Regions:
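Alpha-helical tetratricopeptide repeat
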Residues: 1-107
């Protein structure tokens, strides 16, 4: 219980740090990406997707952001858009995205 409370507190602190980084430097793409990853860890996929969108808007070639946004969309049940993101990630060099697409489409 104490460990869970500590982890929640740490996540809140980290989230505030990312918020501050974004406020100070809104163009810093990795702040959005890392905040999105933290939100995924907290299973807040909707908010994570918003942050991945921001990262991709700032760097349209950010393969990892497409990949992670695709996984977040799949976690929400948005299969078509998740697969589209994974496909884009594959095009940008994350080739294991194709194996996830293959598993999703062979069901």
């Amino acid at each position: 219980m104490l460990k869970d409370n500590r982890r929640a507190y740490e996540h809140e602190q980290i989230m505030r740090d990312y918020d501050m980084v974004i406020k100070l430097n809104p163009g810093f793409v990795y702040a959005y990406f890392n905040r999105a990853n933290l939100r995924c860890a907290q299973r807040d996929f909707r908010a994570a997707i918003v942050d991945y969108n921001e990262a991709i808007e700032r760097d349209p070639e950010f393969a990892e952001a497409y990949y992670n946004r695709g996984l977040a969309r799949l976690s929400q049940g948005d299969v078509n858009r998740g697969i589209a993101d994974l496909s884009k990630a594959g095009e940008l060099g994350i080739y294991n995205a194709y194996s996830i697409i293959k598993r999703m489409t062979s069901r």
